[in-house]
Structures are given as C-alpha cells and as structure tokens.
Amino acid sequence: MQTTANLWEVLCRDLESERQTAKAEQYQEIARKFLDTARQVLRPDSPRLCDAIEIAGDVHQAAGQLQEAAVNFRDALEKSEQFGSAPATARLSAKLALVLDRLGEAGEARGFYEMALSLYEAMRDHSQHALLLNQLGALCKGQGDMDAAEKYYLRAMEVAGALHGSNHPETAAAANNLGVAYIETRDFVKAENLHMQALSIRELCYGAMHPEVAQSMANLAVVYHSMGNYQKARAFYVGALKTFKCFREANDPEVQTVQANYDALLQLMEKSAS
C-alpha cells in the first residue's frame, strides 16, 4: 500500500511530466485532472490537499487563466488559515493579490497585498518584502492614491537597501518606481534624483548596454523633456533608443513609446528654433 507521501510524489511527478509536453491551452485540463485526483487520494483535512489546490492555481496562472487561478488560490488560502499555517497564508495572500490585481480588482487585491505584507513582517521574513511593497505602490499609483504609493515605494527602497545594499538591482527598481510616481505628480526634481540614482546603480550592476539602463535613460529623458531642458532630454532619448534597439524589436511597445516621445521632442525643438 502506498503512503500519502508516496501518492503525493506520484501526483506531482505526473503533473510535471504532463506540463513539460503540453501546450498552454491544455493546462486547464491538466490542472483539473491533477486536482480531481488529489481530492480522491488525499484526506479533506490534509495539508497536502491545500498544496494541491495551490499548485492547480499556479498551473492556471502560468496559462493566463486568471479567473480559475483566483478560485484555486482563494480555496487554498481558506484551508491554510484553517490549518494555521502563517507561511502558506502569507504566500497565498500574495498570489491571490497579484491575480486579482491583474484582473482589475484593485480594491480587493490591495487588501490581500497588505495582509501578505503584514504576515511576512510578523514572521520577520523579508524575502518578499520589497516585492510586495513595490506591487502595493504600483497598485496605489494606479488607483490615483499617490500618497500611499509614495509611502510604499519609499519603504521598498529602505527594505531593498537594508537587505541588499545601496548598489543592488532591487534598490534600483525601487528608486525607478518611485521616480515614475514623482513624474506623474510632476515633482521633477525628486524624479530626476531618483532616476539618476537608478541609472547609476544599473550601470554599475549591468554595464552600459542593458535594457534596464535604457529604461532609466528613457525616464530621465521624460524628466528633462517635461522640465524644458531639451538638449539633455534629447541626449537621453538617443541613448535609450540606441540601447533598447540592441535588445528589442522596433515594434516593441516600450521602444515605440520612447520613439514617440523623442519624435515629439524634435518637433517641439523645431518650433522653438523657428
């Protein structure tokens, strides 16, 4: 007779085998089959069943089936709370928040992000801290709550700096995100300082030719464009486009946005000169 542990290993092995050969459109059926089998062989009060439901949610999410993923993550979260597993509850809250965020359910997503953040802080587990703070900042920015966005982005910078040091990609990402928020609130001096910081860190970490370096240059171009410093803006647009085009196609949305901004700047400079 197989033990529960052995059955679980067989289930997971079979799932992974199917995923490796399946197409994305087959993931929904794979997840359903896996979960149905898990419900048959595992006790309803088994923590492994909670794991199985979470894995099914992961499969749906990987296939872009966000509604189905949300259903699974909710179910798994409810069970993890019943078991009193703080790590699982924190992890599932974060997963559910991300899926709801992508589904446009910002209000509910914010609650689950904050729940996950609180649990990770209580456990003194900082592995997801900066990521969650950045996600909360982005969500609040999207809601137009710029005060909350600034608060979360500032905390993300502090956490990233404390965990990784001042010259780390995570610290640069947090500085970049806060800088973008300041562009939207037209606080261009703060935005300039943060994007310069992000650019300096990224050049140190990656060298001059890297997409994230190009992103920082493009953001600085927008700052100087908005401040009326057209010569600096032009230099950063040119640098950003040169770097981006080494890694992206011309029809890439980010490249097209930078190109459109650069074209608008050139038109403005022509008018100013005439």
Question: What annotation goes with each model-predicted range?
Answer:
Residues 21, 40-44, 79-85, 121-125, ...:
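Short coil/turn linkers that connect adjacent helices within long alpha-helical scaffolds
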Residues 9, 13-19, 47-62, 87-102, ...:
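Conserved alpha-helical positions within TPR/SEL1-like repeat arrays
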Residues 1-9, 42:
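TPR-adjacent "capping" and linker segments in tetratricopeptide-repeat scaffold/adaptor proteins
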Residues 14, 26-41, 75-78:
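Amphipathic alpha-helices of TPR/Sel1-like and other helical repeat/solenoid scaffolds
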Residues 246-274:
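Terminal, low-structured helical/coil segments at or just beyond the last alpha-helical repeat
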